[in-house]
């Protein structure tokens, strides 16, 4: 889906890519090719200090979207020498929050957004592909937890 996106050394910032809208994990496992395609977005940020290739942490927000405490953690990751990719699943779908409607953006949708970003970021010459992690808060924690599951 994103095979043609190539990032160059030093390239960071806002990234647009393709993802899809599987409603639940069943659709990821059995019908991902039938899920509607969307334009997804995120931010790749490198530490100010240090020399790559950098380990990377994919950061996934919770039901109330990105908030101040998430950014505090991200700053700590950057200061510790990690690159981060901040997944923006809600913005990609025009949703501000799922607190009142958890079905408007599901964990399955957010997982596909994260893994599609992984496909792109793992080809970046400044990323150490042997050191890739994921963290999430609340709903994003669900994405993080299930990302290690092998069916």
Question: Which residues does each PLM region occupy?
Answer:
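N-terminal cap/lid segment of alpha/beta-hydrolase-fold proteins
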Residues: 1-52
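Surface-exposed, active-site-proximal loop segments in enzymatic domains
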Residues: 95-104
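Alpha/beta-hydrolase fold nucleophile elbow
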Residues: 127-138
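Short glycine-enriched nucleophile-adjacent loop
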Residues: 141-151
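Short substrate-entry loop that stabilizes the transition state in hydrolases
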Residues: 50-54, 59-96
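Short, conserved glycine- and acidic-residue-centered signature motifs
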Residues: 35, 70, 107-110
